[in-house]
Amino acid sequence: MRLIAQEAPLGCAIACAASLADLSYKETRRYFDDGEIKEQTSGFYNRDIVNVLNKVGIRTKAYGIKRRGNRKIKFSSIVFIGRCPKYPAGHYLLKTTNGWTNPWLNYPYINPIKAGFQKRLSGGARWIIEIIK
């Protein structure tokens, strides 16, 4: 998996899917319906990510976390954390063996947006997208 930074304010879903699929950000954005618009305006839902990963041959499923807390989350899972002061629109991160891949580690700075690894999840997981074996 490559470390990929998001290129738009709401592009964390694209960056996480790109990292998981080992594709570039721009290449992955083409698989999203209205990707160039949604990355600037509304963001993406879990089903959007699942559909894109299925298109590139990675079978996944998404499910919600009913209670607060971060149960055992498998490696190569994309997690959505709910709205919080740091991420007012919520945020997607990818779990790897190196820690959590955060496609906008230096939020709120935008020039440039930097991706990086962090040891802990910044907030509680609300949704998980994981690979089906």
Where would I find each of the regions flagged by the language model?
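Active-site nucleophile-adjacent alpha helix/oxyanion-hole segment immediately C-terminal to the catalytic cysteine
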Residues: M1-T41, N46-N51, K55-I58, K133
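Conserved active-site-adjacent core of cysteine acyl-enzyme catalytic domains
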Residues: F32-G124, E130
